[in-house]
Amino acid sequence: MTQDKYAYIYNKVKDALETDKLFLRPELSLSLLSRVVGTNTVYLSKAINNGFGCSYSQLINCYRINYLIEEAQRTGENIALLAARCRFWSRSTFFDVFRQHTGMTPHRYMENVRRSSFPKHMHDHEGQRIIIEKG
């Protein structure tokens, strides 16, 4: 597959996630996203790996955590309710994913946000800033 095709798929994925907020749909899967984008799952997976620098599940979780944090800051809504709306059905999975992306528990993160002008960017489990988009 050509670089132009990968770039096209990358842009379609980005649009589906950012504009259509597909990551909030309960039935979202790699297969569904491939149909929305208009490609097969192999090309989609490769385009995600190359364009976003992560796997499909890491990408979806990153969008979900970013959305959850933005909504919690904007509305003050309970973070556990937001986690369910963001399709984190297991509390332990949510806590693990949240900690991987922020470096702390949801409660501690929100306390820091409320107390100060705590940076609102995300980190992966090694303390590196998460890059949603290369380039």
Predicted segments with their positions:
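Central "turn" residue of the DNA-binding helix-turn-helix
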Residues: 35-38, 87-88
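Terminal helix-turn-helix DNA-binding modules in bacterial transcription factors
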Residues: 50-86, 112-135
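Short, Lys/Arg-enriched, Trp-marked, Pro/Gly-tolerant hinge/linker segments that flank
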Residues: 1-11, 50, 54-55
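A short alpha-helical element within helix-turn-helix/winged-helix DNA-binding domains
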Residues: 28, 32-34
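The alpha-helix within a helix-turn-helix
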Residues: 34, 45, 83-84
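Basic, amphipathic alpha-helical hairpins
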Residues: 14-28, 48, 52, 69-77, ...
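Residues within helix-turn-helix
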Residues: 31, 42, 78-81, 91-92, ...
